[in-house]
Amino acid sequence: MSSISPFVAIRRDLHKIPELGFQEFKTQQYLLRYIHALPQERLEIQTWKTGIFVKVKGTAPRKMIGYRTDIDGLPIKEETGLPYSSEHEGNMHACGHDVHMSIALGLLTHFAEHPIQDDLLFIFQPAEEGPGGAKPMLESEIMKVWKPDMILALHIAPEYPVGTIATKEGLLFANTSELFIDLKGKGGHAAFPHLANDMVVAACSLVTQLQSIVARNVDPLDSAVITIGKISGGTVQNVIAEHARLEGTIRTLSVDSMKKVKERIEAMVSGIKMAYQCEAEIDYGSMYHQVYNDPELTTEFIQFAENYQGIRFIRCKEAMTGEDFGYMLAEIPGFMFWLGVDSPYGLHHAKLTPNEAAIDQGISFLISYITWKGNN
């Protein structure tokens, strides 16, 4: 049996115990056990809910560099068939947060033993997949004291080969919002539709109307998506449904488009209420701020990546992906980038299988970048 690196082994350990947002208790304990086993001379450790802050004191600090990783899993039943598959039935690390954590621990291990001039702050953030941990973590008393001067994070990219790094200046990820619409009418016997207000029909009409928003209300040079991923309503085949619920997501590349889309949704729901004589409620659930990369820091990072041996850099396009790291970037200059992991299955897929060779390569690259940035 071939040996694997310690950080690949860590990734496999973490892959077995995916936990949902703000329920990452086993994950937090695993991380803390590892962190407490490192040399402690330069470390300061604080917990926040199920997250962790670790400050690495520099030798002659002039600034603080932040590095953030997310730690939660998804409510997806794993289908990889791997020997280290999820032991938590119905949950999976299907977005690569196990890879993200193992890379962060690799960096922390190095800098605990080989400090640089500047202070470092490692942020192990819960609930990225929902309901959102970045914003409350940013607003915490801990981060008011330990607020980095710059911050960075990565996300795995299944579509890129191992050895690839991709990013761009400015807008990288979209503004996102959940969407839940509840309709309440009047149920009744299927034989007497005139005596009821059918919420299945109302819901179907609303879904069709929503599709016109992107086509006719959003600037064609901008981009927006409204996806209804789930419709529920009714009880049995011969009873007219009193309730119906739509669940979906909104994604836009601009803040103005998000505002416009929500205005149009609200107008259409008001129309449905009148047309079908029903009640309706809209809940936008979790909302994530766009990921906007600081142009100066990102350009500098791109130049570093382009000159780093063994790395292929790609200047990518913006994506409709959502990431609550955008809240941190709205307050702290920094950037996010894609790290290629070459998987035939994409993010949030039950068969996502990142190439683990990306872990040690990502650690080596980021050690070099952070060392260079923190000593200059």
From Swiss-Prot:
Q: Which residues form the active site?
A: 70, 129 (proton acceptor)
Enzyme Commission number(s) of this protein? 3.5.1.47
**Superkingdom, natural source:** Bacteria
Keyword Ribonucleoprotein among record annotations:
no
One Pfam family name is M20_dimer
Named from the GO MF annotations, one term is:
N-acetyldiaminopimelate deacetylase activity
- Read off the InterPro entries from this record: AcetylDAP_deacetylase (IPR023905), Amidohydrolase (IPR017439), Bact_exopeptidase_dim_dom (IPR036264), Peptidase_M20 (IPR002933), Peptidase_M20_dimer (IPR011650)
Q: Which GO terms describe its biological process?
A: diaminopimelate biosynthetic process; lysine biosynthetic process via diaminopimelate
Q: In which pathway does it act?
A: Amino-acid biosynthesis; L-lysine biosynthesis via DAP pathway; LL-2,6-diaminopimelate from (S)-tetrahydrodipicolinate (acetylase route): step 3/3
Listed A to Z, the keywords are:
Amino-acid biosynthesis, Diaminopimelate biosynthesis, Hydrolase, Lysine biosynthesis
**HAMAP family, sorted:** DapEL
According to its UniProt entry, what is the function of this protein? Catalyzes the conversion of N-acetyl-diaminopimelate to diaminopimelate and acetate.
| Family named by the database record | Belongs to the peptidase M20A family. N-acetyldiaminopimelate deacetylase subfamily.
Q: What name appears for this protein in its UniProt entry? A: N-acetyldiaminopimelate deacetylase
